[in-house]
Amino acid sequence: FPYATEEVSFTNGDYTLSGTLTLPEGYSRKTPVLLMVTGSGQQNRDEELFDHKPFAVIADALARAGIATLRYDDRGLGDSSAKPMEWTTEDFKSDALAGLELLRRRFDKVGVLGHSEGGTIAMMIAAENKADFIVSLAGMAISGAETLLWQNRVALKGLGFTDEQVAPYCKMLETAFDVRVNGGRMPNPDDYNV
């Protein structure tokens, strides 16, 4: 390969996150570097799914183009420490900020490339002016509730459900999201003819 890789780790509070730094030939402090943040659900540094490793492929292409990357295992996965629990997007953003700190010690121009939830995290970091640039791959530009409703609606329609069948289910989901944010009693599916 026309680049080097280096196994690294960084900490965020009680968590140690492990990853792979991919360094193009002739890299220096002036080489741009991207922190790669995975999408929702626990994922390894390569965002591996069905033996496909999209983050490894992207890191390879970027290194060949002269851009360094750091991709890392999510909390509690691969070589990263943690016991599984309920983590939020804010928690994963905090992990990404810790990764950016590691990169800033070695590089002058540091950005974030995020996929799905990682794209949203990239935008959150950019809004705080903590990255020099970002790349969002399918990051949400609408609320999480709106995204989940849309995803469920599309999935159910794709499975052949009619609008009349999908509507009460999505109404129940809307109520559940509202209860999760504002408190109250979770909806009973029987009340929605689901």
Question: Model regions: which residues?
Answer:
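Short beta-strand element of the alpha/beta-hydrolase
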Residues: K30-S40
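Primarily recognizes the serine-hydrolase "nucleophile elbow" in alpha/beta-hydrolase
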Residues: G99-F161
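Conserved alpha/beta-hydrolase
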Residues: V57-D79
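N-terminal cap/lid segment of alpha/beta-hydrolase-fold proteins
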Residues: F1-R29
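The serine-hydrolase catalytic nucleophile loop
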Residues: N44-V57, D74
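Accessory cap/linker subdomain of secreted extracellular hydrolases
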Residues: L137-V194
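Alpha/beta-hydrolase active-site loop
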Residues: E86-R105
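Alpha/beta-hydrolase
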Residues: V37, Y72-D74, L137
